A protein has these predicted regions:
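N-terminal targeting signals for export/organelle localization
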Residues: 1-52, 191-192
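Short, ordered coil/turn segments that flank beta-strands lining enzyme active or ligand-binding pockets
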Residues: 58-59, 160
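Short active-site neighborhood of thiol/selenol oxidoreductases, capturing the structured segment around
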Residues: 64-86
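Structural microenvironment flanking redox-active thiols in thiol-disulfide oxidoreductases
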Residues: 86-127, 138-144
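Thiol/disulfide oxidoreductase modules built on the thioredoxin-like
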Residues: 122-131, 136-188
Length: 192
């Protein structure tokens, strides 16, 4: 009896195997492969308000991007386990060092690590990152509010009006001429 049950199960499972797809005829287009986010600038969200999601500020209190309205801000989503994220952190730190001082651009790098905030502080210290605050979003509320297609690293430029200008998917040298050109698209409040 046991053999019969196993044989029936085998036959049933064999009928459930994925069927191979026939090649399309020469006059038919092949199905498009699903593409994930491509590295580079994405302007498809331009003009959307910054999400209201809250995350932790460097002191451990809650904050949202509304706190930065009136000043353009570059928001970077990163994690310690993400090699491209770690690669670009020093250039974000240098950007924060040169731009946060004059109020022309805020730089907010938000860790997506699930561990406690002190581990984010220790990680940044280990990298000798001094000018980026240890913003932390262990529940990934901010990345979730930005949409299901957000990958790490992703940087979002929010204008002084609180609306998205662009997203940059992937790592970038934020001290490069390419980055300077992109960042120039954000005009501080009151500066034409």
């Amino acid at each position: 009896m046991r053999f019969i049950v196993i044989a029936i199960a085998f036959v049933a499972l064999a009928g459930c195997q994925k069927q191979t797809q026939q090649a399309p005829a020469s006059n038919q287009a092949a199905p498009a492969a699903e593409a994930g986010p491509v590295k580079g600038v994405d302007r498809s969200h331009r003009g959307q308000p910054a999400p209201a999601a809250e995350f932790n500020n460097p002191d451990g209190g809650e904050i949202s991007l509304a706190k930065f309205k009136g000043v353009p801000v570059l928001v970077n989503l990163w994690a310690s386990w993400c090699a491209p994220c770690v690669k670009e952190l020093p250039t974000l730190d240098k950007l924060a060092q040169t731009h946060d001082v004059d109020g022309a651009l805020g730089v907010v790098a938000v860790s997506q690590d699930s561990g406690p905030q002190p581990s984010v502080v220790a990680f940044l210290k280990k990298l000798n990152v001094k000018d980026l605050g240890a913003y932390h979003d262990p529940n990934m509320a901010l990345s979730g509010a930005l949409g299901p297609d957000v990958v790490l690293p992703t940087s979002i430029l929010i204008g002084a009006d609180g609306k998205e200008v662009w997203r940059y998917v992937g790592d970038l040298d934020w001290t490069s001429p390419e980055a300077a050109k992109l960042l120039a698209e954000a005009k501080p409040a009151g500066k034409g």
